[in-house]
Amino acid sequence: MGSPLQTLSRGGRVRAALWCWTQARGLSGRQCPNRVARSLSCSRGFPVRGGRPALGGTMVSVLTESFLQGTQHFSSWDCCQSLHRHRAPVQVTDSRRNLGMDHREEGFQVGTEDDREPKASLPRGNPTGPPCSLPPELEPPTNCCMSGCPNCVWVDYAEALLRLYQDGGEKALAILEEHVTDENLKAFLRMEIRLRMQSGA
């Protein structure tokens, strides 16, 4: 029945399908419309006109497909399943998802704008104050022979600092701590400064 049924018009296919359905179910001709109407009413969204289902293109394709596949037991349950297969899938709009994404993106952009705000930079350097600046004539000596001679240029340097800063030697000690790197020389100069502070020189 496959190829002759395909060549029929829509009305012819409907009549042929209904005739096969009644023959398979063993129904009489007058019982066919009522039973078909009750069987087709199980499908949701199927239009009904005057107590009978309106056989549109969807129902025609359902009946044709069932009999082209050689189905002999065409019941109301088969009709419902076929109609569900032929129903167009519902297209879910992305408005809700886009709305949520807009809020998330907006929050993300706001956060990035806050993060891009310039932050106050912390001052660098010595927190206690700028390093001591010395006049050119009081720069640390670079011509020490490191032999321990009595006329050491570092001793002369310490005496010059004591004469410049009349504060009891504290400023001179601070300058020596900053400019002298050798620990032995630093200890020697601290001792010389304290001796001169005690002697009042």
Swiss-Prot record:
<dbReference type="InterPro" id="IPR039251">
    <property type="entry name" value="OXLD1"/>
</dbReference>
<feature type="region of interest" description="Disordered">
    <location>
        <begin position="102"/>
        <end position="134"/>
    </location>
</feature>
<dbReference type="InterPro" id="IPR019180">
    <property type="entry name" value="Oxidoreductase-like_N"/>
</dbReference>
<protein>
    <recommendedName>
        <fullName>Oxidoreductase-like domain-containing protein 1</fullName>
    </recommendedName>
</protein>
<feature type="domain" description="Oxidoreductase-like">
    <location>
        <begin position="134"/>
        <end position="161"/>
    </location>
</feature>
<dbReference type="Pfam" id="PF09791">
    <property type="entry name" value="Oxidored-like"/>
</dbReference>
<dbReference type="GO" id="GO:0005739">
    <property type="term" value="C:mitochondrion"/>
</dbReference>
